[in-house]
């Protein structure tokens, strides 16, 4: 299973937050993808 991305913290840069959001979306997509 993919590793859950680590939250960069409340004082993270916008770039870090965007990177985290993208990784989190990909992580959730992999978790919710149906397994046939």
From Swiss-Prot:
Keyword DNA damage among UniProt keywords: no
Q: Which Gene3D superfamilies match?
A: 6.10.250.900
GO aspect biological process, one term? feeding behavior
> Which residues are annotated with the PTM Tyrosine amide?
36
Going by the UniProt record, its keywords in alphabetical order are: Amidation, Hormone, Secreted
* Keyword Secreted tagged: yes
What Gene Ontology molecular function terms does this protein carry? neuropeptide hormone activity; neuropeptide Y receptor binding
Indicate what this protein is called per its UniProt record.
Pancreatic polypeptide
């Amino acid at each position: 299973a993919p590793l859950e991305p680590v939250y960069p913290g409340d004082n993270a840069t916008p770039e870090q937050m965007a990177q985290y959001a993208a990784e989190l979306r990909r992580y959730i997509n992999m978790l919710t993808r149906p397994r046939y």
